[in-house]
């Protein structure tokens, strides 16, 4: 019976969050506890079945996430796979990440949420989520509940054994998916090493491995992605992590696709956003969308930190 009444309570929370109204601190705490129980059973390479709709960075742009669900279909009617970066930069990180975690707890088989490089204690203290939690709750407890939960998020997902999804990119320390399965992910994102690379690396026009201008992860060339896909029986690496003006961008002779789902990123970049629908035969189509009509911005005094595009 307890499960049933919790589901009912969750439905009320989801309804409230859909109106961009935050939960109480104690509600967030119990939501995060429940989410840990679910995520702890998921793999570093979480298996996902098609049909599924794959999404890139959202970055606290709550009204644009609503637009994404309007275009792609509501959860749980549509299965979703989000590739990280739910928080920072946008004005509504709290409501955005709370809603996605609530949907995960309510419909664990219908939505997959991966870890991005912003799902980290260190990064969120610089790029907005920490300050937003302080402003909206008056203390850092909610920030702590979420950043503790972030350690449990799966690092990657595999759609029908063929399409490999993750936030950033490949790693010189990783040749096979089994290498990823063997990592201990229950920790803050390290400054270097395989787990860091999966969340920070970027594809590049130059071959081989390169030093990343981001100061973490690597750049990797087409030779690397072709070899990785071939060795692991993959048809595609799907990733996010980089702003692309059309919302999606193919590279490496279609071995890699970048998907970015925050339109007019940082409320000023003028980009479209996109999501990738995979049907039950793994045929893909991209849906592009523009920002939701702007409501008045919240009154925030903030220094906008420099950021990598």
Curated annotation (Swiss-Prot):
The active site is at 118 (proton donor). Inhibited by the interaction between PPP2R2A and ARPP19; this inhibition is enhanced when ARPP19 is phosphorylated. Inhibited by the interaction between PPP2R2A and PABIR1/FAM122A. Its cofactor is Mn(2+); Fe(3+); Zn(2+). Fe(3+) binds at residues 85, 117, 167, 241. Transmembrane segments: none annotated. The modification Phosphotyrosine is found at residue 307. CDD domains: MPP_PP2A_PP4_PP6. It is found in: Cytoplasm; Nucleus; Chromosome; Chromosome, Centromere. One of its GO terms (molecular function) is RNA polymerase II CTD heptapeptide repeat S5 phosphatase activity. GO terms for biological process: mitotic cell cycle; negative regulation of hippo signaling; positive regulation of NLRP3 inflammasome complex assembly; RNA polymerase II transcription initiation surveillance. Mn(2+) 1 binds at residues 57, 59, 85. Zn(2+) binds at residues 57, 59, 85. It catalyses: O-phospho-L-seryl-[protein] + H2O = L-seryl-[protein] + phosphate; O-phospho-L-threonyl-[protein] + H2O = L-threonyl-[protein] + phosphate. The modification Leucine methyl ester is found at residue 309. Binds 2 metal ions per subunit. Can be two manganese ions, or one iron ion and one zinc ion. Its EC number is 3.1.3.16. Gene3D superfamilies: 3.60.21.10. GO terms for cellular component: chromatin; chromosome, centromeric region; cytosol; INTAC complex; nucleus; spindle pole. Its main location: cytoplasm. Keywords: Centromere, Chromosome, Cytoplasm, Cytoskeleton, Hydrolase, Iron, Manganese, Metal-binding, Methylation, Nucleus, Phosphoprotein, Protein phosphatase, Zinc. PANTHER family: SERINE/THREONINE-PROTEIN PHOSPHATASE PP2A-RELATED. PP2A consists of a common heterodimeric core enzyme, composed of PPP2CA, a 36 kDa catalytic subunit (subunit C), and PPP2R1A, a 65 kDa constant regulatory subunit (PR65 or subunit A), that associates with a variety of regulatory subunits. Proteins that associate with the core dimer include three families of regulatory subunits B (the R2/B/PR55/B55, R3/B''/PR72/PR130/PR59 and R5/B'/B56 families), the 48 kDa variable regulatory subunit, viral proteins, and cell signaling molecules. May indirectly interact with SGOL1, most probably through regulatory B56 subunits. Belongs to the PPP phosphatase family. PP-1 subfamily. PP2A is the major phosphatase for microtubule-associated proteins (MAPs). PP2A can modulate the activity of phosphorylase B kinase casein kinase 2, mitogen-stimulated S6 kinase, and MAP-2 kinase. Key mediator of a quality checkpoint during transcription elongation as part of the Integrator-PP2A (INTAC) complex. This is Serine/threonine-protein phosphatase 2A catalytic subunit alpha isoform. The lineage of its organism: Eukaryota, Metazoa, Chordata, Craniata, Vertebrata.
């Amino acid at each position: 019976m307890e499960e049933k009444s919790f589901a009912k309570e969750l439905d009320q929370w989801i309804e409230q969050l859909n109106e961009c109204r935050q939960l109480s601190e104690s509600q967030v705490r119990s939501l995060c506890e429940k989410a840990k129980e679910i995520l702890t059973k998921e793999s570093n390479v979480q298996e996902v079945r098609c049909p599924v709709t794959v999404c890139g960075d959202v970055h606290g742009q709550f009204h644009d996430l609503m637009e994404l669900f309007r275009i792609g279909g509501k959860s749980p009617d549509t299965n979703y796979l989000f590739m990280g970066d739910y928080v920072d930069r946008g004005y509504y990180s709290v409501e955005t990440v709370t809603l996605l975690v609530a949907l995960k707890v309510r419909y664990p088989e219908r939505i997959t949420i991966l870890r991005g490089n912003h799902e980290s204690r260190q990064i969120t203290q610089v790029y907005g989520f920490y300050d937003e939690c302080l402003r909206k709750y008056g203390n850092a407890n909610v920030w702590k509940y979420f950043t503790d939960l972030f350690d449990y998020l799966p690092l990657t997902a595999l759609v029908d054994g063929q399409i490999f999804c993750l936030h950033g990119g490949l790693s010189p320390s990783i040749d096979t998916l089994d290498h990823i399965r063997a990592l201990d992910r229950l920790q803050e994102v390290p400054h270097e090493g395989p787990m860091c690379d999966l969340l920070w690396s970027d594809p590049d026009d130059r071959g081989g491995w390169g030093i990343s201008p981001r100061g973490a992860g690597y750049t990797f060339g087409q030779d690397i992605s072709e070899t990785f896909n071939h060795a692991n029986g993959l048809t595609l690496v799907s990733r996010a992590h980089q702003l692309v003006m059309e919302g999606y961008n193919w590279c490496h002779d279609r071995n890699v696709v970048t998907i970015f789902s925050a339109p007019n990123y940082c409320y000023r970049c003028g980009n479209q956003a996109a999501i990738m629908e995979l049907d039950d035969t793994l045929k893909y189509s991209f849906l592009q969308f523009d920002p939701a009509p702007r409501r008045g911005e919240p009154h925030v005094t903030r220094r906008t930190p420099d950021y990598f595009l």
